[in-house]
Structures are given as C-alpha cells and as structure tokens.
C-alpha cells in the first residue's frame, strides 16, 4: 500500500514486483500467503496507478544467495550424516543473472504489462539432489538421510529455536508444494 502511494505521489508509471512461485493468498505457508496477498492487492489497485509486471521465480541461486548458502553453511557443521527434511520437494532453480536479465528486458516491453510470469530454470531437482550437488561441490563425504514427513515437521519445530532459524515450520509448510513450472515461461539457468 505504501509503495503504491509513493508511486502515485511521484508519478511513477512502472512497477516490477518480484514475488514467489506458488504465491497464493490461500497457500500452505505464511510466506506464500503474504506473497499472494501482495500480488492480489497490487494487481487490483495498482493497475490504476502504473503498468505492473509480477515475477514469480522458483528458488533463486547465485553468488551469496540465501538458499544454497544456507545448506552449504549447515554442511560445514555436519561430520558425515545430514538429516534432510522435505527431501522430495521439487525445485526448478533460477540463476540470479538469468532472472535479472528477464526482469530488465521486461521494463519497456508493453506485452509484459499486467502479466504474471512463473519463472523456472530448465531442470527440476529434488531438495535431496540439490543438497547432494552442494556436498559434491564442497568435496565432502556426507550421506544425506531423508526424513519422513513427521520427522521433517519435528525437525522444523526444533530448528525454529536454533539461532538464525535455518529451517522453520513455515519453510516446512512451503515445501509441501513443489516449486516448479508447468506450462508457464521458463528460461535457461544451470545449477551444475
């Protein structure tokens, strides 16, 4: 609401909103619900003020990202076994450079006005596969131990109290929905 007010007050006619894949006001997690609510508000009231484009990327990776680095840092403290919650959740990681280029190219593209783009990389990985790629990159000998759904939820509950909250109930709830594109726009970005 504040952003729309500022845009109106300053005669800004273009808004690029980065949301999240699976954003939905009725989504399974607080994160996805708030992303969905923001999108809905923006598309309902913002169109009167500016040309809006919404981008919904799957998980974003690149230099100093929060997703890959979170697991990389956790693996630094892991001797040989890594218990992994929500190991079957699927992602289509998007490289930040590819995402940035797509966003920049849409700025003056009138065909993107009013559009919502679900953005994914070319490959689908399970969370387990992503963590195994990180382990391989770190040249570590760590075995990933997939947790059951109930153990995943328990891990999330416990991790809520760990400093930095590396995994939370809200993360667990978000992981109940795969972060992949179906027939929507995807572009090339390579995790490997």
Question: Where does each model-flagged region fall?
Answer:
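NAD(P)-cofactor binding segment of oxidoreductase domains
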Residues: 1-15, 33-44
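Structural signature of the Rossmann-like NAD(P)-dependent dehydrogenase/reductase core
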Residues: 14-17, 53-59, 92, 118
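Conserved beta-loop-beta element that borders a ligand/cofactor-binding pocket
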Residues: 19, 40-64, 69
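Conserved sequence/active-site signature of Rossmann-fold short-chain dehydrogenase/reductase
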Residues: 23, 60-62, 99
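Short-chain dehydrogenase/reductase
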Residues: 28-39, 61, 65, 69, ...
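Substrate-positioning beta->alpha
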Residues: 66-68, 86-108, 115-118
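A short C-terminal helix-loop "cap" of Rossmann-like NAD(P)-dependent dehydrogenase/epimerase domains
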Residues: 72-85
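Mid/C-terminal beta-alpha module of Rossmann-like enzyme folds, strongest
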Residues: 106-168, 181-192
